[in-house]
Each structure stands twice: as C-alpha cells, then as structure tokens.
C-alpha cells in the first residue's frame, strides 16, 4: 500500500514497500527510489542508480548511510536541511565544545538519522531506464522536492 504515492507514479513501475532507509535491504540492481520523511510523511526526494559496478540501488543507499555522500544527491539534500536546523547544529557544536567532535562522515550519519527517511524503490532494466523513470516521476509529482533543479 502506497498512500503517499500518486496513482500516476504507482502506474509507472512496481514499487517496493516503504522501509526505513537506515538498515534497508535494497537490491543490487539499477532502479529508482523515493524518500519520504518518517513512516507516513511526504515524499521529498526521487533518485536513481545505474548498475554501479554490480551494486545498483544498494550501492547508492550504502553511500548515503555511510555518511560519505555529503555533497551529492540525497546526502547533500539531507545535510543542507540539517544544517538549517538550529537545534541539530547546536547538538553538533556541543559535541565539539565537549571535546568529542565527529568526523564529516559522522555528521552525515547524524543528518540522516535526523531526517528519519523511509524509502521504496522500483527495479529497472538498466541505468538508462532508471534515468527515464526518475524523470517521469519528477514530471508527474508537484511536490516540494529536495532534488536540486537539473
């Protein structure tokens, strides 16, 4: 059941169930993923992954959950919003002031935890099909995407 996905997007592909991004068991295949805030929050991001040296969607999600994607795609979108949250920044500052600063990847992981993202995905034949599906989703949905304009 996908109460937050429009019928138009549902008709484009076979979407998985929603699961928390952190700890998600994602396939090693190309495809498109949707991210939303919380268990039933609004969809905020659509992304895609090609083959990624045989890692596909799983490789993309692992990059985000490792904290190593602070400057690309969903990782950057989450980090930008966490940095705009004064309470989140104060927590990081308190860590620094107490002599326990985190590395950049730690900040990335903390931002991802703060965002409480849940994801679902659709498998595609290859990276090009994923790119096309991602564009279709972006054109159908009129939401306040976290995606940067392309």
Language-model segment annotations:
Residues 107-116:
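Short, conserved catalytic or adaptor-binding loops enriched in Gly and charged residues
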Residues 1-99, 118-144, 148-150:
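GIY-YIG nuclease catalytic motif and its immediate N-terminal context
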Residues 101-105:
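Low-complexity intrinsically disordered segments
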């Amino acid at each position: 059941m996908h109460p937050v996905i429009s019928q138009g997007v549902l008709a484009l592909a076979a979407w998985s169930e929603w699961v928390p991004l952190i700890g998600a068991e994602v396939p090693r295949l190309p495809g498109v993923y949707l991210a939303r805030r919380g268990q039933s929050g609004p969809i905020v991001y659509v992304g895609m992954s090609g083959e990624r040296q045989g890692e596909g969607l799983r490789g993309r999600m692992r990059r985000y959950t490792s904290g190593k994607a602070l400057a690309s795609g969903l990782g950057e979108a989450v980090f930008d919003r966490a940095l705009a949250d004064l309470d989140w920044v104060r927590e990081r500052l308190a860590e620094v002031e107490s002599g326990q600063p985190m590395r950049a990847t730690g900040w990335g992981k903390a931002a991802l935890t703060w965002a409480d993202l849940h994801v679902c995905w659709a498998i595609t034949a290859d990276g090009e099909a994923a790119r096309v599906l991602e564009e279709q989703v972006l054109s159908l949905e009129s939401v306040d995407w976290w995606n940067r304009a392309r």
